[in-house]
Amino acid sequence: MQLTDTWMVRINSNQDLLKRGKWVNLTFTFGIENTDYLIEIINGKVNSIKKRVLSTKSGVFRIHGEIVSWEKHWLKNPPRDYHDIFAMLAKKIIILEGDLTPFIQNLQYFKDLIASNRTSND
């Protein structure tokens, strides 16, 4: 599974999400299995999603999960424990590490940003 430009378009075309994240300026690491992506956000808009090739490059914080976990989270109607980042965190389905201050300060923004990759059908 790779993160696609489609996800970036969904995020950047969601005016409510952009308004909510207008003060977010950072890069965070999003992991799927053994692959990490650096997601750069400028004023709430995703500027780039790049595969991390050097382990010395990292984001302010990192969210990591297995491919099956993200696939379940991104269903139109996710099953119990996969519907929300914190539910997934509580069940140890995902890992969240690093400086969590900007994540918590902009919690709804990041939850909606990640959920915006949901499919339109199951």
Where are these regions (language model features)?
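Feature captures hydrophobic
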Residues: 1-122
